[in-house]
C-alpha cells in the first residue's frame, strides 16, 4: 500500500493574518498562549503560598529575557559557532534579530534559531538573579516555575509544528506527516510527540501539586520537570532529523549530549536533594 495514502499532508500557512502590514503568525501566537498559561499558574501558586504579590510582578520579566537570551546564545554557541563567532556581522546577528543582506543593508528576521537547553540555562540564571533581589528561596521559585513549564513547552512545540520545523525522520507509520514545505516524504511528527508528552507532564504536575505538594520535598517539582522533559528529549531525538550536518556522524546528536546533564540534575533533585524538608507553604 502506498504510504502516502496513510500520511497527513501538512502545509499550513504560518501567517494567521496580516494587520496593517504586520504579520501575525501562529508561531508567535502559540508562544504567547503558552506564556499566558504559565503566568496564570505561577500567579496562582504565589497566592496559594501567600507570597507578597509585589514580588510576582518582575518575575516574568526575568523569565522572558532569561529564556530568550539563553535560547539564542545556546543555539549559536552549541549548534553553529562558526557562523556567529568568526565575523563581526555574525556576532551582531547572534545578538540582534536581524540578517545582513549580501547586497548590503539588513532586514529584520526575528531570532532564527533558539535552543531549549540554552533557554533552560538562561532561565535558571535569571531566576537566581530574581531570587537575590526578592530574597525568596531559589528552590521554591524554580519549583513553581517547573509546575507551569510543561504547558508552555507544549505550546512551543505546537508552534514548531505550525512552522513545519524540527521535523522527524522519514517513516511509514500511518500517522506520519508530509511536511510539504520541506519535501514529500512521510515523516515522524516529532513536534507533536513532544507536545503530547509535555501535556501529559503538565497534568501530572497539576495532580501532584494539588494533592501532594505539602508532602513533597523542596526541589521535587524542579527535578521532575528536568528529568521528564530531557529524558523524553533524549529518546525522541532518535526519530528526529538532525539540526546541523556535523551531527550526522555522531553517536548521539548535540541535543542528546546536552540533555544528559539536565537528566542527572533532575534525578538528583527528585530523589536526593533536601528530602527531609518540604517546600515552604
From Swiss-Prot:
One of its GO terms (cellular component) is plasma membrane. It is a multi-pass membrane protein. Signal peptide: none annotated. It is an enzyme of class 2 (transferase). Keywords: Cell inner membrane, Cell membrane, Membrane, Transferase, Transmembrane, Transmembrane helix. GO terms for biological process: lipoprotein biosynthetic process. The chain crosses the membrane at residues 26-46, 59-79, 110-130, 136-156, 189-209, 219-239, 252-272. A 1,2-diacyl-sn-glycero-3-phospho-(1'-sn-glycerol) binds at residue 157. Pathway: Protein modification; lipoprotein biosynthesis (diacylglyceryl transfer). Its EC number is 2.5.1.145. It is found in: Cell inner membrane. Catalyzes the transfer of the diacylglyceryl group from phosphatidylglycerol to the sulfhydryl group of the N-terminal cysteine of a prolipoprotein, the first step in the formation of mature lipoproteins. Belongs to the Lgt family. This is Phosphatidylglycerol--prolipoprotein diacylglyceryl transferase. It comes from Bacteroides thetaiotaomicron (strain ATCC 29148 / DSM 2079 / JCM 5827 / CCUG 10774 / NCTC 10582 / VPI-5482 / E50). The lineage of its organism: Bacteria, Pseudomonadati, Bacteroidota, Bacteroidia, Bacteroidales.
Amino acid at each position: 500500500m502506498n504510504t502516502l495514502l496513510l500520511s497527513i499532508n501538512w502545509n499550513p500557512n504560518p501567517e494567521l493574518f496580516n494587520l496593517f502590514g504586520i504579520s501575525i503568525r501562529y508561531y508567535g501566537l502559540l508562544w504567547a498562549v503558552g506564556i499566558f498559561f504559565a503566568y496564570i499558574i505561577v500567579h496562582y501558586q504565589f497566592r496559594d503560598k501567600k507570597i507578597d504579590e509585589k514580588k510576582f510582578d518582575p518575575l516574568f520579566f526575568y523569565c522572558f529575557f532569561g529564556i530568550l537570551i539563553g535560547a539564542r546564545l545556546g543555539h549559536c554557541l552549541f549548534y553553529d559557532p562558526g557562523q556567529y563567532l568568526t565575523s563581526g556581522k555574525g556576532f551582531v546577528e547572534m545578538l540582534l534579530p536581524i540578517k545582513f543582506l549580501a547586497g548590503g543593508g539588513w532586514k529584520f528576521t526575528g531570532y532564527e534559531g533558539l535552543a531549549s537547553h540554552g533557554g533552560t540555562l538562561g532561565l535558571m540564571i535569571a531566576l537566581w538573579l530574581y531570587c537575590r533581589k526578592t530574597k525568596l528561596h531559589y528552590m521554591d521559585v524554580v519549583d513553581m516555575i517547573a509546575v507551569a513549564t510543561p504547558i508552555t513547552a507544549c505550546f512551543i512545540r505546537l508552534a514548531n509544528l505550525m512552522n513545519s520545523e524540527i521535523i522527524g525522520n522519514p517513516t511509514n507509520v500511518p500517522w506520519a506527516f508530509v511536511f510539504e514545505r520541506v519535501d514529500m516524504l512521510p515523516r515522524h511528527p516529532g513536534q507533536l510527540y513532544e507536545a503530547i508528552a509535555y501535556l501529559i507532564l503538565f497534568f501530572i504536575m497539576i495532580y501532584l501539586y494539588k494533592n501532594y505538594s505539602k508532602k513533597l520535598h523542596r526541589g521535587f517539582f524542579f527535578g521532575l520537570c528536568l528529568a521528564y522533559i530531557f529524558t523524553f528529549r533524549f529518546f525522541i531525538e532518535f526519530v528526529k532529523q538532525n539540526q546541523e550536518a556535523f551531527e550526522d556522524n555522531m553517536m548521539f546528536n548535540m541535543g542528546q549530549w546536552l540533555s544528559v546533564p539536565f537528566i542527572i540534575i533532575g534525578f538528583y533533585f527528585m530523589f536526593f536533594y533536601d528530602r527531609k524538608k518540604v517546600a515552604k507553604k
